[in-house]
């Protein structure tokens, strides 16, 4: 029972993590950050769709094989999860710094910036929960009953 519950938790948190990451990409393309350089995705562009496709591919391919019983892919997903943690944490620190130091003008699109911050916070929390779900050791009572 524990293994099935753990596997379901990993699946659900992986899907939530993918959703939050996609939200960050889409909301970022709607924000003033989309005008910050020549290589930034703008909303509806081919680059945005390719980015979303790549993110979903990198999330869903290892997850599909994990669901088929290849549990060693949990470590590959952990590497991607770590990258997601790094991106979420750095974005949560970078956006307020840009605002405080006056390097970016967020006045017209505050809603998209707040959406990015909420999505980053959701990604951060979801990825931490993912690590707990994926690598939690069974409790002593469960071990005794087995």
Locate predicted features.
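Alpha-helical membrane-associated segments of multi-pass integral membrane proteins
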Residues: 13-14, 101-137
